[in-house]
Amino acid sequence: MKKKILIISGGISKERIISLETGKQVAKELKKNNYLVRICEPDKDLLTVIKEFKPNCIFNALHGQFGEDGYIQTILETIGIPYTHSGVISSAKAMDKEISKKIFLKNKILTPKYFIYNFEKTNKELISFVRKKFNFPVVIKPINEGSSVNVYIC
């Protein structure tokens, strides 16, 4: 009997389009290797699809928020379905750039200087602070987005 793989792709992150493409490519390769494959979105029907399809494993093709941050992993672990990707804690730590940075520094892994902007400074104060503390160019990146979403080099 063929092993059944459910691919979860799409989602609501800013990386939705690339996630859908990832899902299609993974499905193509798995089918070539004789797996029974189904693709679904992580929506209100996900648990029903899992219950009806009864996959041996779930391939997590989600990118960004809800796919790489431990959220979908928590759901899958709670219902006891094996899945691809790092576990809940590893995913959450890796997706949060502040937590990742602290882990790197604690383990003496060199990283560029950084600070977390929490919107308490005015734009003028922020620019003044950055000019004093950093050499240009600087990289501005959201704390919890994936890939290069909303990354700016200034």
Say what each PLM segment does.
Residues 53, 109, 134:
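Structured loop/turn residues at beta-strand edges in well-structured enzyme cores
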Residues 1, 33, 110, 136, ...:
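Residue-level signal for beta-strand positions within conserved beta-sheet cores that form or flank
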Residues 103-111:
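Basic phosphate/pyrophosphate-binding loop/patch that engages nucleotide-derived ligands
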Residues 19, 112-116, 137-154:
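Glycine-rich phosphate-binding loop of ATP-grasp-fold ATP-dependent ligases
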Residues 127-140:
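Acidic/histidine-enriched active-site and ligand-binding environments that engage anionic O-linkages
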